[in-house]
Amino acid sequence: MQFSFLTLFPTLIESYFTDSILKRALQNGLISVEALNIRDYALDKYQKVDEPPISGGAGQVIRADVLGAALQTLTHSHIIFLSPCGKPFQQYDALRLSHKKHITFVCGRYEGFDERLVEQYANEVMSVGNFIVTGGELPALMLCDSIARHIQGVLGNADSLQGESFEDYLLEAPNFTKIFNQKIKFSATPSEYSKGNHSKISGLKKRLAICKTKYFRPDLYQAYRVFIEQQQLNNKVVK
């Protein structure tokens, strides 16, 4: 899959792919990445890309003509604008988008984009939460990372995708490790975890995942309850 980033700061993007899992995915040809500098599409020698909003007020807005010129070169790409007004990105979006051939992330700065750019070029507008950051690069990288994990071969062990948080609207069950420094005291771990009965471990993990979700994310727990009720209803219809 190809990932393109339209940005005013290409080095912010490029540096992310110099380590860890996505570096290996890049080296193995599982993904390709390009960071396109919006300034390269500017019309003057000063590479000016922004203007004050015509309605007045503080801040600058990325110009439609400059960014539009860049977007016109990406005719066969699935274009995602990063914006606080976008749909909150979810785990199922990562899986869905992992089947695309080419995704372009449009990273805003200042007060955002000329609205006509979104109307004319956006396939989707995404947000990573109800908060503001200084630019769209970090949110774009978050989406890219989440999507890339679902591409076959990117994770060393495909089983790592099983039982993750947000699968079936639940958080992942708690994980524990062996303790080698006995001088530091911790509470005991669930005894079933270390007995090797995978059926019982699986059942316990499901119960703990439900408890964890109910405690940390009551909103997600309500969605889980609706999901279960819908499943039960569907099963009755099938019978």
Curated annotation (Swiss-Prot):
Its EC number is 2.1.1.228. Keywords: Cytoplasm, Methyltransferase, S-adenosyl-L-methionine, Transferase, tRNA processing. Coiled coil: none annotated. It holds the Pfam family tRNA_m1G_MT. It is found in: Cytoplasm. The keyword Kinase does not apply. GO terms for biological process: tRNA N1-guanine methylation. SUPFAM superfamilies: alpha/beta knot (SSF75217). InterPro entries: Alpha/beta_knot_MTases (IPR029028), tRNA_m1G_MeTrfase_C_sf (IPR023148), tRNA_m1G_MeTrfase_TrmD (IPR002649), tRNA_m1G_MTases_N (IPR029026), tRNA_MeTrfase_TRMD/TRM10 (IPR016009). The keyword Transferase applies. GO terms for cellular component: cytosol. One of its GO terms (molecular function) is tRNA (guanine(37)-N1)-methyltransferase activity. S-adenosyl-L-methionine binds at residues 108, 128-133. It catalyses: guanosine(37) in tRNA + S-adenosyl-L-methionine = N(1)-methylguanosine(37) in tRNA + S-adenosyl-L-homocysteine + H(+). Homodimer. Specifically methylates guanosine-37 in various tRNAs. Belongs to the RNA methyltransferase TrmD family. PANTHER family: TRNA (GUANINE-N(1)-)-METHYLTRANSFERASE. This is tRNA (guanine-N(1)-)-methyltransferase.
